[in-house]
Amino acid sequence: MKLHELQPAAGSRKVRNRVGRGTSSGNGKTAGRGQKGQKARSGGGVRLGFEGGQTPLFRRLPKRGFLNVNRKEYAIVNLDQLNAFEDGAEVTPVVLVESGIVKAEKSGVKILGNGELTKKLTVKAAKFSKSAEEAITAKGGSVEVI
């Protein structure tokens, strides 16, 4: 193989199809838009959800539910994730964010009981599940709601 024999992989390069450049090109005259009509014009086409004047589906269906502006969303941490800390360490939301276990604090951190805790820790968080609280205290650690 020589330098002048190098070629791109088959199908990796596709020539852009220039439309409206003469009838013999195969895409001249109407440029693949069919005959006349709204969709053939420049800027033509109907808006999203338009059904030709018929009441669109999104207006035929009833409204449902609401968005609670006071909704609290907690960052969730499971017990097995807390094993990343040293024995006897104090775990706070700030420490969890710094260590990368939690991306953002949100409305606070909630500790759930999935997995097994092997370290004695002092955990400070906004909420704890019952099983998580029991597991932390069973290992000799302490729980503090902040």
Swiss-Prot record:
It comes from the Bacteria. InterPro entries: Ribosomal_uL15, Ribosomal_uL15/eL18, Ribosomal_uL15/eL18_sf, Ribosomal_uL15_bac-type, Ribosomal_uL15_CS. Belongs to the universal ribosomal protein uL15 family. GO terms for biological process: translation. The lineage of its organism: Bacteria, Bacillati, Bacillota, Bacilli, Lactobacillales. GO terms for molecular function: rRNA binding; structural constituent of ribosome. Part of the 50S ribosomal subunit. The keyword Signal does not apply. HAMAP family: Ribosomal_uL15. PANTHER family: 50S RIBOSOMAL PROTEIN L15, LARGE RIBOSOMAL SUBUNIT PROTEIN UL15M. PROSITE patterns: RIBOSOMAL_L15 (PS00475). Residues 23-35, 42-51 have a biased composition (Gly residues). One of its GO terms (cellular component) is cytosolic large ribosomal subunit. Residues 1-51 are annotated as: Disordered. This is Large ribosomal subunit protein uL15. It comes from Streptococcus gordonii (strain Challis / ATCC 35105 / BCRC 15272 / CH1 / DL1 / V288). Signal peptide: none annotated.
